[in-house]
């Protein structure tokens, strides 16, 4: 029985570690751009446990379905477009670096999946945030209609990419 649980537990633990790597990438980039962060959490919902290190609260939450870094949104919005892109891409960069370093291992593959998955322009994901920063920079202002068009077309494009990837893996 325990032998059957070990691979499942390994994937769960390595996925959690890859999510932490992702958020640490955002944290390092935010620190580099002087954007304050108040919380790094693994999971969502009520807090199970946590600790404070410096100004940041590190929390484990009850629903382990993701992770997040709580940044000062006002401070981030005041940064230049390249700085905002660096903060939004920080997690992806860390995941891809770890994927290369851990090439051929389950941890490497999980980091690759999380990094590439976050590049997709789904609403509120890193790829979407980068697209909005680039669009605002090109338009030189916020445009609600343009952001809605980008959001819907980004989600549609992401679904096409995911469908193509699943189809490709099915053919292999």
Task: Please report, for each region that a protein language model flagged, where it lies by residue.
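Hydrophobic transmembrane alpha-helices and their immediate loop junctions
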Residues: 1-172
